[in-house]
Regions:
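Phosphate/nucleotide-binding beta-alpha loop and adjacent structural elements of enzyme active sites
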Residues: 2-318
């Protein structure tokens, strides 16, 4: 082979190697580009799905007036809820944004697990009962209690329309013994109804209601509870005494409740006595901070003279 032929062969080999290197580089670039395009496509699908969900939420987040002071609206979870349009406290918040007591709701949802048993004592429109039913699922159980016949009817309809067969609404008040009482209430302030003995004067509407003690309603030793939400405008002390056996056999139960010395006194119960009752059962209180986190509280502070109303978490341990 002549020097010229050798030089040409070497040049061909060099160019061939260069072409092979370029082909390999292009192949890597093509693979990288394909990966990036796949990521972009996936991201576009995620964004599209998000926008569709948001659009559906906006489309559904309308309040439909049904007549007779009744509307159907949607919680922020997308679940339907029936509302008394006269309610200027709870009802108006539900119709405006599907939310109520946001930091308290966040804590409540964090406590309720799939398959749990939840009691909603003072269910009102059924807001917490709906949240509970969503979270416990078909393997769980929700027992809700609301003596106001109007609100009980709305809450029952809400649970039914969402298909929560494992959730039940009892149109009764919860106390320390079986019996009868009167519920006084103002439709404009649906969260403020209170129980009293029959026969007294009233400036508000009055309804005769049945009172039940939960220990008598659920006497089975196998019946235990995981979470209790309770807001009964000062009747909490009596309601707790009526479920003492349930509390004793539910070691891990968490209770979210309103604690108001003034309202408890109006219901004929001393706040310190309620605190003592819970302490004797091993319960300690926690307050709820702005980030929905429980912070240790003291019974002495909660029951002190002039103490305000607090939404608290009561448990044996967290």
């Amino acid at each position: 082979m002549s020097d010229q032929q050798l030089a040409e062969a070497q040049e061909v080999a060099r160019l061939t190697g260069r072409v092979a290197a370029l082909e390999e580089q292009l192949s890597r670039m093509e693979a990288m580009l394909a990966t990036r395009l796949d990521r972009i496509a996936t991201r576009q699908e995620e964004i599209g799905s998000f926008l569709i969900k948001r659009a559906n939420r906006i489309a559904e987040a309308q309040t439909l007036y049904l007549g007779d002071h009744t509307a159907m609206t949607f919680l922020e979870t997308g679940h339907r809820i029936y509302v008394d349009t006269r309610s200027r406290d709870i009802g108006i918040h539900l119709m405006a944004g599907g939310r109520w007591e946001t930091k308290y709701t966040k804590l409540f949802r964090g406590l309720v697990k799939r398959g749990a048993t939840v009691l909603d004592v003072g269910a009102n429109h059924g807001f917490y009962a709906i949240h509970a039913a969503t979270l416990v699922g078909a393997t769980g159980r929700v027992e809700a209690f609301e003596p106001n016949p109007r609100l009980a009817g709305l809450a029952t309809a809400s649970l039914r329309t969402n298909g929560f067969r494992w959730a039940r609404l009892h149109q009764v008040a919860v106390g320390d013994a079986m019996g009868q009482a009167e519920l006084t209430f103002n439709p404009a302030m649906s969260g403020g109804g209170s129980i009293r003995k029959p026969g007294g004067p009233a400036k508000e509407e009055v309804a005769a209601v049945e009172v039940v003690a939960l220990d008598q309603l659920f006497p089975e030793e196998s019946f235990t509870v995981d979470v209790i939400k309770m807001d009964v405008e000062g009747y909490e002390g009596r309601a707790l005494r009526g479920m003492e056996a349930i509390l004793r056999r539910s070691p891990d139960v968490k209770i979210l409740m309103e604690f108001s010395p003034a309202l408890l006194a109006r219901g004929g119960v001393d706040a310190a006595a309620v605190a003592g009752f819970l302490q004797d059962l091993g319960f300690q209180p926690w307050s709820v901070d702005e980030d929905s986190r429980p912070q240790p509280a003291r019974w002495e502070t909660l029951t002190a003279k002039g103490a305000k109303t607090h939404n608290i978490l009561v448990a044996r341990s967290l």
